[in-house]
């Protein structure tokens, strides 16, 4: 509006107020109404309004932002029109106010127009002569209507107010920027955490791989030495391998050496012994150190993979299998292979009981020096037994090759052998449940050799003296010294007649033809021993026939009428289960059939003894139309005369070759008190003198 268009109630020519009045008017708050009121400014409340509220003039939409109290236009003595005010926007700092703008920094007191300089402009502006100017300078309506900070309008129109309002704007902007940065910071933290977690997972994976490699290096010690064939951990079933008797070996009694020899098993025990990981067949002779020093033990123990296979705690039963002993260690354990420690002797040598420094008992089978036959058996036993681990089989726990000395080390079982309890001086009679348990356990062990080993293993020396018993009378099949690895397509393994007379199958005794059914025949003879309590061959000469010849017709009659009284051991006093007796008699009769093809497999015998198969299932080994029990009536079967002729021929061969009984480890010196079945050579001599030439046997 023009200069002369002031409100009617406004004074026509406002005189410049005194400095004091101007101060009071400057401090007065603008009128409450939005319109430019003509009323003179009433004395407002005290100074706190002017100092405390920088009335932003921005909310008055019709007028541009006030010049922020810098009404310093040239010659505008209280008549600041709109145009001048518009021109003064942004010129708040000019020098046209004649030094009146010394207090330009009004700290946001934009609307009062009182620069506290006492100039004419201040007085004119405070009198409200210019409505628009008052609206802009005094912020009459804007002061009441604009609680928000002088934001948008003042920012656009005047550069200096933004300076006063800069802190709020910058703070608002800062809050926005910080809000935008928060997600970025969280994302960065998440990425870093994920990368760290991935790194930890990779480290754990590498550690697991390293441990697996170390475990693999432990087994090569045995596998690389020809001990393990991948049949599983050789040391996981040591709890079952508590057997140690018969060990075919020479008894060269050498002066005992000092007793502080340590066994490979004892982790740090004093006696040194060398525990070398070298394979048994060609291992180098035991190196120095037979003096029993712990240093020798540690040096020999280290081997290629020694540290990776720490010796087990002494409480573990004999620890590792197939460990190398020094001769001095075994001599010390057996008190110099003294007679008091002699368990038995046989064609290969002697068996001595030994006690290791850690208190464990062992049985040491030593081979006769210079016995080529014994050396061959030693090689076979070390190679085969080390590959076999089963609950019902004996495991080789150590060996010794020192120059010409070759010895096998087994766990010692204090419960002796089946032969001892059946025919020895134990003074106790095995009850029927124990006999059945022994039969079942030995059948499972032999079935494992025949059907679960690859290549399969034929024992070739099944007999009562090779069935060891633990404290609970669990059976353990022992002495694989005669066993040979037999490929499926190879049946003629050896012409050397091994084994014990009375247990040999007819076809094997006559021709040396070897199959798993030869072991079945020997097992059938052992079952007859359990049932009858008789030996395979009568050593007294009172019974001309063998146990098999005597029992065959009785088994047939018992199967027909169910009367087993003539067959059963009288010491049992008829204390047995009839159906269990029928099962065992049927298994024995089927196993000793003349025809090898008609004998059942060991797995079939196991099922029959457990009661899981009918007796007719035992005939599955034969051809259709043949007798299901004893195999009679078939032209392919041996008759009694043929079998007897074969036995006579075998007796003559055994006498001439002196190989009979070579596999037996117990002789007259056996602690069992009686000659074992293998020592029936005297009976052979008695009967062999009367034998005539026999026709060659036929195996159809």
UniProtKB/Swiss-Prot annotation:
Cytoplasmic-side segments: 208-700
Glycosylation sites recorded in the entry for this protein: 176
Compartments, as annotated in UniProt: Cell membrane
EC numbers on record: 2.7.11.1
Record domain Protein kinase: where: 337-615
Residue spans of biased composition, Low complexity class: 48-137, 255-265
Record membrane topology: Single-pass membrane protein
Amino acids binding ATP: 343-351, 365
Keyword terms: ATP-binding, Cell membrane, Glycoprotein, Kinase, Membrane, Nucleotide-binding, Phosphoprotein, Receptor, Serine/threonine-protein kinase, Transferase, Transmembrane, Transmembrane helix
Spans annotated as Disordered: 1-180, 249-315, 616-642, 659-700
Residues bearing the modification Phosphothreonine: 326, 495, 500
Phosphoserine: modified positions: 465, 494
Biased composition regions of type Polar residues, renumbered to the chain: 689-700
Cross-referenced PROSITE patterns: PROTEIN_KINASE_ATP (PS00107), PROTEIN_KINASE_DOM (PS50011), PROTEIN_KINASE_ST (PS00108)
The keyword Cytoplasm is assigned to this record: no
Pro residues composition bias: residue spans: 9-19, 29-47, 266-286
Catalysed reaction, written as an equation: L-seryl-[protein] + ATP = O-phospho-L-seryl-[protein] + ADP + H(+); L-threonyl-[protein] + ATP = O-phospho-L-threonyl-[protein] + ADP + H(+)
GO MF annotation: an example: protein serine/threonine kinase activity
InterPro entries attached to this UniProt entry: Kinase-like_dom_sf, PERK1-13-like, Prot_kinase_dom, Protein_kinase_ATP_BS, Ser-Thr/Tyr_kinase_cat_dom, Ser/Thr_kinase_AS
Active-site annotation: 461 (proton acceptor)
Pfam family, one: PK_Tyr_Ser-Thr
Residues annotated with Phosphotyrosine modification: 410, 508
Family, per entry: Belongs to the protein kinase superfamily. Ser/Thr protein kinase family.
Stated name of the protein: Putative proline-rich receptor-like protein kinase PERK6
Organism listed in the record: Arabidopsis thaliana
Gene: PERK6
């Amino acid at each position: 509006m023009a200069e002369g268009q002031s409100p009617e109630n406004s004074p026509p020519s406002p005189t410049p107020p005194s400095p004091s009045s101007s101060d009071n008017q400057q401090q007065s708050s603008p009128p409450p109404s939005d319109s430019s009121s003509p009323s003179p400014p009433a004395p407002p409340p005290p100074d706190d309004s002017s100092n405390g509220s920088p009335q932003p003039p921005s909310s008055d939409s019709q007028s541009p932002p006030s010049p922020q109290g810098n009404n310093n236009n040239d010659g505008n003595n209280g008549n600041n029109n709109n145009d001048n005010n518009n021109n003064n926007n942004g010129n708040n700092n000019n020098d046209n106010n004649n030094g009146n703008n010394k207090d330009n920094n009004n700290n946001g007191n934009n609307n009062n127009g009182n620069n506290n300089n006492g100039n004419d402009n201040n007085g004119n502006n405070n009198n409200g002569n210019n409505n628009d100017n008052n609206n802009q300078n005094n912020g009459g309506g804007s002061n009441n209507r604009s609680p928000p900070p002088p934001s948008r309008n003042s920012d656009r129109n005047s550069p200096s107010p933004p300076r006063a309002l800069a802190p709020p704007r910058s703070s608002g902007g800062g809050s926005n920027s910080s809000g935008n940065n928060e997600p970025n910071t969280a994302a960065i933290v998440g990425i870093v955490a994920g990368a760290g977690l991935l790194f930890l997972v990779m480290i754990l994976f590498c550690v697991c791989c390293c441990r697996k490699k170390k475990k693999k290096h432990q087994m090569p010690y045995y596998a690389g030495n020809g001990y393990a064939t991948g049949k599983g951990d050789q040391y996981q079933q040591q709890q079952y391998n508590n057997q140690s008797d018969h060990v075919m070996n020479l008894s060269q009694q050498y002066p005992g050496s000092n007793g502080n020899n340590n066994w490979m098993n004892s982790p740090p025990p004093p006696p040194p012994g060398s525990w070398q990981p070298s394979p048994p067949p060609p291992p180098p002779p035991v190196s120095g150190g037979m003096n029993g020093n712990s240093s020798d033990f540690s040096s020999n123990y280290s081997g290629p993979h020694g540290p990776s296979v720490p010796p087990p705690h002494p409480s573990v039963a004999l620890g590792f299998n197939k460990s190398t002993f020094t001769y001095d260690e075994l001599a010390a354990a057996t008190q110099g292979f003294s007679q008091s420690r002699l368990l038995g002797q046989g064609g290969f040598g002697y068996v001595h009981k030994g006690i290791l420094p850690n208190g464990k008992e062992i049985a040491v089978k030593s081979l006769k020096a210079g016995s080529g036959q014994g050396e061959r058996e030693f090689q076979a036993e070390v190679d085969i037994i080390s590959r076999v681990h089963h609950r019902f089989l004996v495991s080789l726990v150590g060996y010794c090759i020192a120059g010409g000395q070759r010895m096998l080390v087994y766990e010692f079982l204090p419960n002796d052998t089946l032969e001892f309890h059946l025919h020895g001086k134990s003074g106790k009679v095995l009850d029927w449940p124990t006999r059945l348990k022994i039969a079942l356990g030995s059948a499972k062990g032999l079935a494992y050799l025949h059907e679960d080993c690859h290549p399969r293993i034929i024992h070739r020396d099944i007999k009562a003296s090779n069935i060891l018993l633990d404290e609970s009378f669990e059976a353990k099949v022992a002495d694989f010294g005669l066993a040979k690895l037999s490929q499926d397509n190879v049946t003629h393994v050896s012409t050397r007649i091994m084994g014990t007379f009375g247990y040999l199958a007819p076809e094997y005794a006559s021709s040396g033809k070897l199959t798993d059914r030869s072991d079945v025949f020997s097992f059938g003879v052992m079952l007859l021993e359990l049932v009858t309590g008789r030996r395979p061959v009568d050593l007294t000469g009172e019974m001309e026939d063998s146990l098999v010849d005597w029992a065959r017709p009785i088994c047939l009659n018992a199967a027909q009428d169910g009367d087993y009284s003539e067959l059963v051991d009288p010491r049992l006093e008829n204390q047995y289960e009839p159906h269990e007796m029928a099962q065992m008699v049927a298994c024995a009769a089927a196993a000793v059939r003349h025809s090898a093809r008609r004998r059942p497999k060991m797995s079939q015998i196991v099922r029959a003894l457990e009661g899981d198969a009918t007796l007719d299932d035992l005939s599955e080994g034969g051809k259709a139309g043949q007798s299901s029990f004893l195999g009679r009536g078939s032209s392919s079967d041996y008759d009694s005369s043929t079998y007897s002729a074969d036995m006579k021929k075998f007796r003559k061969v055994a006498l001439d070759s002196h190989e009979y009984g070579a596999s037996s480890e117990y002789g007259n010196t056996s602690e069992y008190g009686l000659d074992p079945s293998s020592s029936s050579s005297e009976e052979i001599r008695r009967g062999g003198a009367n034998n005539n030439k026999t026709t060659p046997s036929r195996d159809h």
